[in-house]
Amino acid sequence: LVDIAEAIINKRIESNEKKDDDLLGILLQMRDQISNEHIRDEVLTLILSGHETTANVMSWAFSYLAKNPQVRKQLEDEADNATWIKEGRTPTYLELEESSKVASAILQETMRLAPPVWVAPRIATTDCTIDGVKIPKGAHVLVSQYVTHRNPRFFPEPEKWQPDRWLDSNFEKSLPRGAYFPFGGGSRKCLGEYFALAEARLILLMVAKNFRLSGKFPKAQPRATYRPKGEVKNKVSLR
């Protein structure tokens, strides 16, 4: 990944292309203020946090939809009724939010069962005791979204993919803090949460408006992210 990031940067530098309409172009204009290593790390962050995580969520979401035609039909109906799609224009954030209740529920349930970040490392900043377990200052603690999101105390039939649970406005309010945290929590919660959700909702609705996907449900291959094993092959047909 480091090699990929450095190749992207070097290619842009060698092209002598002056761009200020993307992040890399802006960073390269600041080379007298920040190091090449800093720029490389920013590119790595974009690759890991802004690309792979969202791509994994979309792969799982379309795979679940292929297995659940009733939910797919709900999404298609929502896409058909979206005014901004009918008018062929880009929605405002508020329009997107108001016209994507089903799409949002699909994403929330997908991230519950297949959270792109499935385990979150933290370091204890002070001695503490959690549920009777003593944790010394400096200890490395791993908190797993994958495990927590399957707690039957909070999610009835936890192994079933049921987006409808999120359409109940009281459901998410009833969850205690920390029961559902696909984007982490606290002061280090993912800064890209709202952008990622908007991007994913747009993709779901635009695909559902025009296409229908079907294919074999993939096996999981948890690595740095919770990803499908190998290629996710789907048959794509026009609606």
What are these regions (language model features)?
Residues 1-58, 72, 88, 100:
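Conserved cytochrome P450 catalytic core segment spanning the I/J/K helices
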Residues 3, 56, 101-105, 178-181, ...:
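A structural signal for well-ordered alpha-helical segments within the folded catalytic domains
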Residues 8, 62, 145, 200, ...:
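Hydrophobic, repeat-rich solenoid/adaptor surfaces of innate immune receptors and signaling proteins
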Residues 17-26, 64-117, 131-139, 156-162, ...:
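Cytochrome P450 I-helix active-site segment
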Residues 25, 143-172:
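Conserved cytochrome P450 K-helix/beta-meander segment immediately N-terminal to the heme-binding cysteine loop
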Residues 49, 89-94, 119, 131, ...:
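Cytochrome P450 heme-thiolate "Cys pocket" and heme-binding signature region
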Residues 53-78, 193-210:
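Cytochrome P450 catalytic-core helices
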Residues 80-84, 189-239:
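Cytochrome P450 proximal C-terminal region
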